[in-house]
Amino acid sequence: MEILKYTEDHQNFRKRFRRFLEKEVTPYADEWEKAGIVPKTAWEKMGRAGFLCTEVSSDYGGLGGDFLYSVIVIEELTHTGQNGLIAPLHSDIVVPYITAYASDALKKKYLPGCVSGDIVTAVAMTEPVSYTHL
């Protein structure tokens, strides 16, 4: 029984993303791991190819896709063997706060850059009582 109902569009997206990873990510994963950083150009290539913030509305340059596009990105990234290009943190954890809570002016200012990879978001938090600093 198939739980996730992928459409033909989803499968085509998966194939495109897999080819992108084979060309633009996997060959460099060890180099990035040793350097301790993923170059900004990798984010920009991923964004310009349409693989960042897949759920962001086309009004801001996004795909306007459903959640399954994000699932595909996560699934395919797991096969690369790299840990640095954590696009799901950017696309699926941080950016949704902007889409849900930012004013229209802030959405117009930041979302296009998030989608294109010109802006890379992050999250930082602290729980002083439990001494957790992420």
For each feature predicted by the language model, list its residue ranges:
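Acidic, proline/serine/threonine- and glycine-rich low-complexity intrinsically disordered segments
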Residues: 128-129
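A non-catalytic, amphipathic alpha-helix used as a structural packing/dimerization or gating element
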Residues: 9-23
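Internal helix-loop-helix
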Residues: 48-108, 112-120
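Intrinsic disorder at enzyme termini
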Residues: 1-9
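C-terminal helix-coil-helix/basic helical segment that borders enzyme active sites and/or dimer interfaces
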Residues: 26-37
